[in-house]
Amino acid sequence: MTRCNPLFPYVYRLGMPIFDRLFYRRYRRQAMGNATGRLLMVGLGPGTDLMFLPPAVTSVAAVEPEPAMRRMASALARRRGIAVDIVDGIGESIPFPDNSFDSVHVGLVLCSVDDVAATLAEIRRVLAPGGRLVVLEHVRGDGAMGRFQDLIAKPWSWLASGCEPNRRTVDAIAAAGFDTGRLHSIRRTLVPPPCTPHLQGFATVVKAGA
């Protein structure tokens, strides 16, 4: 994941609770409700999504490249008594063996990985057969919104530590060999541009011959 603005982890940690109250808390909980079994969280950030782990999850591991974010997530997990193995890593090179997880969660992270295709290929590799890619992402909009996101993508990317607001994430997930039929668009939210609309749900690997 791109490291551009060194202050971003702290700005994110201060500002994100506001967006959580306005919008994300509800959708984080809904997205996490799709996770089961052995869960990997890619791009854990400050660990907010750990608060919404469903009973169906049996173990939790996470990769996060930013030391400040890892410290915040570890502190949150300790406060709430959550057992999680947080390791230094990036989505493009996940440090776990093949078929290690029943679910892999990406929450507001595919916008900022350096290589979306490589990240999704790695997620596919570590998912066990029948596993789920659990998704909550902001994505490129249609029409004027999409053009606006294209226009400000570069300055926004620097400001937000590599976040690109104009990524066509559902297309990338489909191209990586996932069935996107359980993903849906949330077009109207209280989150301001350029971080809207959103994509939520889960995807599974397309079976050979399907």
Regions found by a protein language model. Name each.
Residues 18-38, 48-52:
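Conserved alpha-helix/loop element of class I SAM-dependent methyltransferases that forms part
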Residues 40-93:
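Class I SAM-dependent methyltransferase SAM/SAH-binding core
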Residues 92-104:
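A short acidic, Gly/Pro-enriched loop at the edge of an enzyme's catalytic core
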Residues 103-115:
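A short SAM/SAH-binding and catalytic strip from SAM-dependent methyltransferases
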Residues 117-129:
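A short glycine-rich, Lys/Arg-flanked "PGG" loop and its adjoining helix->strand segment in the class I
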Residues 130-138:
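Conserved beta-strand signature within the Rossmann-like core of class I S-adenosyl-L-methionine
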Residues 162-177:
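Short alpha-helix
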Residues 185-210:
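Core SAM-dependent methyltransferase catalytic element
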